[in-house]
Amino acid sequence: DMKIVFMNKQPADIENVLNDNIVYVGSDEMESGKYQGEFLSDYFKAQGKDEIKYLMVNGVLGDIAQIQRTESCLQAFEDQGMTAVEATAPVVADWDRANAQDLISPLVNTVDFDCIIANNDAMALGAAEAMEQQGGDLENIPIVGIDATVDGCQAISEGRLAMTVFQDADGQGFGALTAAVNLIEGNPINEGSEYELDETGHIMWVPFEPVTAENVEDYM
């Protein structure tokens, strides 16, 4: 039988697609949003706040990454005892920096919000640029992203973004090659790596890592 390794982007209906010959290597999107929610919960609790209003800048609606990054962030707020209310209708910027800037700009001075949560760094940077252009309070309104891109990490070091989440592309590539060899040889797909499998043995998880001002230098 043909061996297939999906990498990074999960196939639709993943539970019914994967089997002993068809596997997936990637990062658990539920983990990435969780890190955003935990960071923001700690940030606001340190100020004595347990109720916040947020702007959510979404990728393409319906993408598995958009759904799980958003849901896991909001779940983390709940798990941390935070009351988080969306300040306006969801902002849908389709993963694009310019779209995010255009959509956030009119909200900066018309909507009351405590933070901006973006499904990726590109949109987080667009939101930061909108805040800067419209005179928003970047110092006290944290913006968080996901991916730990070069620009995203640079923005953290400059204080323009508060945090991001590192998605290990090299690790995913190594994991996919490892899984392919193991499929051919009949071994568990994570053999020879440090990565964990899900309960089915058909998914190899490459962990996300939170990136803040404290550790951003390690990712630049």
Where are these regions (language model features)?
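Hinge/cleft segment of the Venus flytrap/periplasmic-binding protein
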Residues: V57-L61, A65, Q80, G175-M220
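Short beta-strand elements in bilobed, periplasmic/extracellular small-molecule ligand-binding domains
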Residues: K53-M56, L74-R97
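Hydrophobic alpha-helical segments within soluble ligand-binding/sensing domains
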Residues: Y24-I52, N99-Q101, A148-G152, D168-N187
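Second-shell loop/turn segments in exported
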Residues: N19-M30, G59-D63, T88-A93, D112-D114, ...
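Solvent-exposed loop/turn segments at secondary-structure junctions
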Residues: Q10-D13, M30-E31, V60-I64, V91-D96, ...
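Flexible loop/hinge segments that line or gate small-molecule binding clefts
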Residues: D1-E31, K53, T149-S157, L161-A162
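Short, solvent-exposed amphipathic alpha-helices that sit
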Residues: S32-F39, I64-T83, N99, L103, ...
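Hydrophobic alpha-helical
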Residues: D1-I4, S72-C73, A89-Q154
